Regions:
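PRPP-associated nucleotide enzymes
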Residues: 1-123
């Protein structure tokens, strides 16, 4: 695949939708990114994660965390490219939490790879 920027990659996979969208935050938006339009194509997912990994490659990231469900794929591929471990959060009682024995140690450098961010409240 030729070198692409993130926006052109998202447009090529028809992940950027235009119209009027009421987001789960209650906000309205003229654009929506349908992440699963990208995630169904492994080669595009890989390229997007390469962009993320390249940006953080020299930051000493030790663990990549993504939210279930869509963020798991992004965090897993990004972690593989960075040579680090990947863990994920799950919603429990309305909050995203580490479960399944996953832990982050004090001082551990973590990269959070979110699948969708509107207000940042779920982080």
């Amino acid at each position: 695949m030729m070198k692409k920027d993130a926006e052109s990659l998202l447009r090529e996979t028809k992940a950027i939708l235009e119209g009027h969208f009421l987001l789960t935050s209650g906000l309205h938006s003229p654009l929506y990114v349908e992440k699963f339009n990208v995630l169904q194509h492994p080669e595009y997912t890989e390229k997007l994660c390469e962009m993320i990994a390249d940006h953080f490659r020299n930051q000493g990231v030790q663990t990549v965390i993504g939210p279930a469900t869509g963020g798991i794929i992004l965090s897993q591929v990004t972690a593989r490219l960075l040579g680090t471990r990947s863990i994920f959060t799950e919603r429990e009682n309305g909050k995203m939490t580490l479960r399944r024995g996953f832990r982050v140690e004090p001082g551990e450098k973590v990269l959070i790879v979110e699948d969708i961010v509107t207000t940042g409240g779920a982080l």
